[in-house]
């Protein structure tokens, strides 16, 4: 191939929602209200959302704005920690793990933004800066210093930092170990018959990897049928048939 992608969940900059709205029109999705919904959801302004983020370059005339926040905060870990809610903490970690798995199954090189490996949340200290440009720039909410005080916790089994870091290390090992993660592998999607579920398949030689990603907040069933073959869950080692999972 003539190129290799660098893939990331978050970086130093804002999220602009650069979606193909010409294509999305066929599904009745209009740009301005859809972006508003996304920005409201990821600020925790929608019922059921535990996300925490802030707007950047909000333009009320164009009804357009960009979003800022760390992966962990946008996935609900900050709110769960504030509430000291273990169930919500577990759900937030599951979201982070799912998104990282989606990152690692892509062709290319996964890039981890500093702090994401330990679930670092938003840093609001920029609002107290003596520098006007800094305190008026919400992008600094996800540009905080690395939390070295939390780094040792990644090696303590059961901590939030350990659960996130260990899962990422496992994904890294799998990406190096199995041929289907190679950049030359064939990649395609399978129909799941559920708009909240995405099934990505990768194949190289006689080896194949299938990833099923649930973007909802509840258990769903992917109505896929991969025949009578026995598959192994690369995370748990469990063996099963991939049919209605």
Model-derived features with residue positions:
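Active-site and adjacent substrate-binding regions of carbohydrate-active enzymes
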Residues: 1-245
């Amino acid at each position: 191939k003539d190129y290799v992608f660098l893939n990331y969940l978050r970086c130093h900059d804002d999220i602009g929602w650069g979606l193909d709205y010409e294509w999305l029109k066929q599904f009745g999705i209009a740009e301005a209200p859809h972006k508003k919904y996304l920005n409201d959801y990821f600020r925790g302004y929608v019922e059921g959302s535990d996300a925490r983020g802030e707007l950047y370059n909000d333009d009320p005339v164009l009804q357009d704005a960009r979003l800022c926040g760390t992966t962990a905060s946008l996935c609900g870990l900050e709110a769960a920690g504030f509430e000291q809610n273990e169930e919500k903490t577990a759900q937030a970690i599951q979201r982070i793990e799912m998104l990282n798995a989606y990152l690692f199954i892509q062709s290319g090189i996964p890039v981890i933004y500093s702090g994401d490996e330990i679930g670092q949340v938003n840093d609001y200290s920029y609002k107290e800066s003596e520098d006007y440009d800094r305190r008026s720039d919400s992008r600094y909410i996800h540009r905080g210093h690395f939390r070295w005080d939390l780094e040792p916790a990644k090696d303590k089994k059961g901590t939030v930092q350990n659960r996130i870091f260990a899962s990422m290390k496992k994904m890294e090992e799998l990406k190096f170990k199995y041929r289907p993660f190679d950049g030359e592998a064939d990649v395609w999607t399978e129909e799941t018959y559920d708009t909240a579920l995405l099934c990505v398949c990768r194949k190289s030689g006689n080896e194949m990897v299938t990833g099923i990603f649930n973007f909802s907040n509840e258990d769903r069933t992917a109505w896929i049928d991969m025949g009578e073959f026995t598959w192994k869950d690369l995370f748990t080692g469990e063996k099963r048939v991939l049919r209605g999972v």
